[in-house]
Swiss-Prot record:
Protein name, as recorded: Small ribosomal subunit protein uS5
GO molecular function, one term: rRNA binding
Gene: rpsE
Any further remark recorded for this protein: Fifteen X have been added to this sequence so that it corresponds better to orthologs from other subspecies of Buchnera aphidicola.
Annotated PANTHER family: MITOCHONDRIAL RIBOSOMAL PROTEIN S5 (PTHR48277:SF1)
Function of the protein: With S4 and S12 plays an important role in translational accuracy.
Family: Belongs to the universal ribosomal protein uS5 family.
Oligomer and partners: Part of the 30S ribosomal subunit. Contacts proteins S4 and S8.
Domain (S5 DRBM): residue spans on this chain: 11-74
Gene Ontology process terms (BP): translation
Recorded domain comment: The N-terminal domain interacts with the head of the 30S subunit; the C-terminal domain interacts with the body and contacts protein S4. The interaction surface between S4 and S5 is involved in control of translational fidelity.
């Protein structure tokens, strides 16, 4: 696994995994490369991309472009999550919960990169089941998408934020 951080404007780009795959044909093997990347603006927007190409730089470039196109907003609460949240994708399940300030990101591999790109500075996260980086990133993005801010819940229920927070 390679970890590369670049700054494109205000976006943080993180390379999570590069994989060599081969296709066997009559004349031998054809090698190509896949790249998994996460992009975030450090202000609650995050996206991931998966690119394939015959060369590593081209695969990374394609993955970064897809990640920039697939960005979504995440409602954070002063550098941590709003509430404990679960996410799943195929065999990977992710549980993420808020942590007090100064805790840092307690997460493994692909989850740490996705949480850091979304600017969640303090969160505890655990992955269950498959630890395939692609599925873990998709499950993490699913969990972040399922997270609701008190304002969103109050608007949905037609109550005030004070009523929701108790």
């Amino acid at each position: 696994m390679a970890h590369i951080e670049k700054q494109a404007g205000e976006l943080q780009e993180k390379l999570i995994a590069v994989n060599r795959v081969s296709k066997t044909v009559k004349g031998g093997r054809i090698f190509s490369f896949t790249a998994l990347t996460v992009v975030g603006d450090g202000n609650g927007r995050v996206g991931f991309g998966y690119g394939k190409a015959r060369e590593v730089p081209a695969a990374i470039q394609k993955a970064m472009e897809k990640a920039r196109r697939n960005m979504m907003n995440v409602a954070l609460n002063s550098g941590t999550l709003q509430h404990p949240v679960k996410g799943a994708h195929t065999g990977s399940r992710v549980f993420m919960q808020p942590a007090s300030e100064g805790t840092g990101i307690i997460a493994g591999g692909a989850m740490x990169x996705x949480x850091x790109x979304x600017x969640x500075x303090x969160x505890x996260x655990x992955a269950y089941g498959s630890t395939n980086p692609i599925n873990v990133v998709r499950a993490t993005i699913d969990a972040l998408a399922n997270m609701k801010s008190p304002e969103m819940v109050a608007a949905k229920l037609g109550k005030s934020v004070a009523d929701i927070l108790g």
